[in-house]
Amino acid sequence: MKRFFCLAITGLLVTTLAAGCGWRLRGTGSVDNVSSVHISSQGRFNDFYEALSRSLQANDITVVKNATDAQYNIVILDQKYSRKTATVSVTVRVSEYQLTEEVTIMILAANGQPLLQRTTLSTERFFDFDENDVQSKEDEANLLRREMRNDLIRQIISRLDA
């Protein structure tokens, strides 16, 4: 009984300390200090723009069409995706690819003052390639690309929340 009590107190203490320093699980909680955002992008209707807009709305942030109506303006300056050979087999065939996705952004206040200067966020994944199973490996690459896009969006939202 004494051991259970000590474990309970220790768990409560660790939880209190973690919550007190602002730590939280990824994807939990909301962005409290942001109410409205405008997204400026050359490709307004590409997958990244749409996913960013959905994620902001899921965090109770209104995405407005006019930059003057927004509390913040996220400017997407550039977006790149690359797929490079990471390793080759003994028979000189691709056995692993490196996927990299980058997005260059700026965050501006409503008055146009830069809050986050031009910053490039990036993420990468590696995946094994099997030439005998090309379709499933392409599906895996597409899944990894969606995960990478979501990771970049989380990075943008965390910078917006900072």
Where are these regions (language model features)?
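Sec/Tat-exported extracytoplasmic proteins
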Residues: 56, 60, 107-111, 131, ...
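Sec-dependent N-terminal signal peptides
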Residues: 7-13
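C-terminal/domain-edge helix-coil "capping" segments
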Residues: 131-162
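A structural "domain/chain start" motif
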Residues: 2-6, 17-61
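Short acidic low-complexity segments
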Residues: 61-72
